[in-house]
Regions:
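Conserved Rossmann-fold cofactor-binding substructure of NAD(P)-dependent oxidoreductases
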Residues: 1-13
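Short, flexible, glycine/charge-rich loop motifs used to bind or transfer phosphoryl groups or to couple energy/partner
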Residues: 2-5, 20, 44, 121
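Conserved Rossmann-fold NAD(P)-dependent oxidoreductase catalytic core, especially the SDR/UDP-sugar
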Residues: 13-17, 24-32, 36-112, 123, ...
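A generic local structural motif
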Residues: 1-2, 96-97, 118
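Amphipathic, well-packed alpha-helical segments that form the structural scaffold of globular domains
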Residues: 12-19, 161-165
């Protein structure tokens, strides 16, 4: 197994593709997966001695309120660090009450937290080079890098499996 020391000393290209893509998560759940998870990877990247670039895989839908999505940085409607602190300290009931106002037109907590995550990643651009990719769709892998690497029936995967089964 690779340990943190080996990563810090040897990684020069880091792809961060992990996220919870469920659309029905509470704000706390989506924040814990998408924001805190990315923040932990960014903190590790900060220590990497040979890092040339940090590539964050986002989604084309994290700025779905825009008429046209350009290849540029979009500031989030809220400070991602502030949202992380708020989620840590507020009760689930309070968060449930304020979530619709925070989403501010976003369709779900996934899109909202992915937009915040882009802002979080951007906040590290003075520490190391970053790139943000916004694919419109992500599907499960069949064999590579190993079977089951991407699990779940989210997005088009369920549709494809359903169509294949008839």
């Amino acid at each position: 197994p690779i340990d943190e020391k080996e990563l810090i000393e040897n990684v020069d290209l880091l792809f961060h593709c992990a996220a919870n893509v469920r659309f029905d998560l509470t704000l706390k759940e989506a924040t814990n997966f998408n924001l805190y998870g990315t923040h932990r990877v960014l903190k590790l990247a900060e220590k990497m001695q040979k890092l040339q670039v940090f590539v964050h895989v986002s989604t084309a839908y994290c700025h779905c309120t825009e008429q046209e999505l350009e290849e540029r940085y979009y500031p989030a409607s809220e400070n991602p660090f502030g949202v992380m602190e708020m989620v840590k300290h507020l009760s689930d009931d309070t968060l449930k009450l304020i979530t619709p106002k925070l989403l501010n037109g976003m369709p779900n907590t996934y899109a909202y937290t992915k937009g915040l995550t882009e802002d979080l990643v951007h906040s590290y651009h003075t520490k190391f080079p970053i790139a943000i990719a916004r694919p419109s769709i992500v599907v499960a892998s069949w064999k590579e890098p190993l079977p089951g690497f991407v699990e779940g029936m989210n997005g088009p995967t369920g549709l494809i499996i359903g169509a294949a089964k008839g």
